[in-house]
């Protein structure tokens, strides 16, 4: 069939993940199509909107390549309902689609590592058995580490199971509440939030601002939980540290499972970058990937944004993304991070991680593990701060900058010859960038 041939052509131009998650779900609607218009059915409005925005023009072009005529391409979700049971399912899906779910966020494209494995497994279990023992699920951790990705993965999984899913930020919950209060329509508000199968609240920490919001959310939580509705929340801190919240809410947040996400290890960051490149069909060599992973800190959103900007600049300049090219394009980003880092920051992290007193690192002790820690600090200070070698030498009361060069040389030799040592230094660098 011509439509299948066109989609097969499209698969060669996009990443395998994009094809699998979006294009493969399209069904050619032969009855609704004509010579001028080609119609595809998508499983839901979210996917239809996404494909229409990103791929419709490309699909039309490929039809033109095959036939010599460029048709209009329509992506729709309209299907004939064969039974009242099917009708009920579709009504559920339509209700669920008034959410913030992004179909790009799935469990399949979430990169799992030691820093997020427990949160990942908890979210997956909550999706597979909603309203059971993982209820509520409270995922917490610093900004940009993947909490929203997991939250929306729960939503997309449950949506595909025919569940009614409501996914909002705490700000949208508050805006919705205020609007319905002012318009005397709280019955509609409660119908929406208390009769869903799955309620997802992103950044729940902001709900502690007013007593009225807390009161409403308290009753929403109770009613949903009593009906075995699944509740998943994300926050930047664990429940007992939430400010402004009543104890009765904090206690309820702890009823189910609390799962934290911590900054990713270096190998997890590398895997995340590789996954992003695979999804967006961006080629970065190993050196560039390692450079980004070790210099961009832990905020995944910032890392992904940096990759997109780097690729866009390379395309505009028609340049290959070499390590030197990446360093040049990203120099301002890296410089900004380095300006926030000083020697005290580095000593604080290194002393804590290597279990050596800061005063020992600053001393002239020749004990082997202290010497090594001091050399690591010097190496990282040259790499991560704006300090010159004479300034570093002065800080450690060394004769001149040649002593700094000697210490850096020793660390470079160890990095080149000892993979475990190299990994340890990279992890230290990673923690400093995050803290800085």
Curated annotation (Swiss-Prot):
Positions of the UniProt region annotated as Domain III, AAA+ region: 100-314
Domain I, interacts with DnaA modulators, as annotated region: 1-69
Positions with a binding annotation for ATP: 144, 146-148
Highest taxon above the source species: Bacteria
Annotated region (Domain IV, binds dsDNA), positions in chain: 315-436
Subcellular location: Cytoplasm
Quaternary organization: Oligomerizes as a right-handed, spiral filament on DNA at oriC.
Function: Plays an essential role in the initiation and regulation of chromosomal replication. ATP-DnaA binds to the origin of replication (oriC) to initiate formation of the DNA replication initiation complex once per cell cycle. Binds the DnaA box (a 9 base pair repeat at the origin) and separates the double-stranded (ds)DNA. Forms a right-handed helical filament on oriC DNA; dsDNA binds to the exterior of the filament while single-stranded (ss)DNA is stabiized in the filament's interior.
Stated family: Belongs to the DnaA family.
Entry protein name: Chromosomal replication initiator protein DnaA
């Amino acid at each position: 069939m011509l439509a299948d041939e066109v989609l097969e052509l499209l698969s060669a131009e996009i990443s395998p993940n994009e094809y699998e998650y979006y294009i493969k779900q399209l069904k050619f609607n032969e009855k609704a199509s004509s010579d001028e218009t080609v119609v595809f059915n998508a499983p839901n409005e979210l996917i239809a909107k996404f494909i229409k925005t990103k791929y419709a023009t490309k699909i039309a072009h490929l039809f033109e390549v095959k036939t010599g005529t460029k048709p209009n391409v329509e992506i729709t979700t309209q299907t004939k309902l064969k039974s009242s049971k099917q009708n009920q399912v579709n009504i559920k899906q339509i209700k669920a689609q008034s959410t913030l779910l992004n179909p790009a966020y799935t469990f399949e494209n979430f990169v799992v590592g030691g820093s997020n494995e427990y949160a990942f497994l908890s979210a997956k279990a909550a999706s597979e058995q909603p309203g059971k023992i993982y209820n509520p699920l409270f995922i917490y951790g610093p900004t940009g580490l993947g909490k929203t990705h997991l939250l929306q993965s729960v939503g997309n999984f449950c949506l595909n199971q025919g569940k009614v899913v409501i996914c909002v930020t705490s700000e949208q919950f508050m805006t919705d509440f205020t609007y319905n209060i002012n318009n005397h329509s709280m019955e509609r508000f409660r119908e929406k939030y208390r009769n869903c199968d799955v309620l997802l609240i992103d950044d729940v920490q902001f709900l502690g601002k007013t007593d009225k919001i807390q009161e409403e959310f308290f009753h929403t939580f109770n009613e949903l939980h009593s009906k075995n509705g699944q509740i998943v929340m994300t926050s930047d801190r664990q429940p007992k540290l939430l400010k402004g919240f009543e104890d009765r809410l904090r206690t309820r947040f702890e009823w189910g499972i609390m799962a934290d996400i911590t900054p990713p290890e270096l190998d997890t960051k590398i895997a995340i970058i590789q996954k992003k490149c695979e999804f967006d069909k961006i080629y970065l060599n190993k050196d560039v990937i390692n450079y980004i992973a070790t210099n961009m800190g832990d905020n995944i959103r910032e890392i992904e944004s940096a990759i997109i900007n780097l690729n866009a600049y390379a395309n505009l300049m028609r340049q290959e993304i070499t390590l030197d090219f990446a360093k040049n394009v990203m120099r301002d980003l890296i410089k900004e991070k380095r300006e926030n880092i000083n020697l005290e920051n580095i000593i604080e992290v290194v002393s804590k991680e290597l279990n050596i007193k800061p005063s020992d690192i600053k001393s002239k002790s020749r004990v082997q593990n202290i010497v090594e820690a001091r050399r690591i600090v010097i190496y990282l200070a040259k790499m991560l701060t704006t300090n010159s070698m004479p300034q570093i030498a002065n800080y450690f009361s060394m004769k001149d900058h040649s002593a700094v060069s000697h210490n850096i040389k020793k660390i470079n030799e160890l990095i080149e010859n000892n993979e475990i040592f190299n990994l340890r230094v990279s992890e230290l660098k990673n923690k400093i960038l995050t803290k800085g």
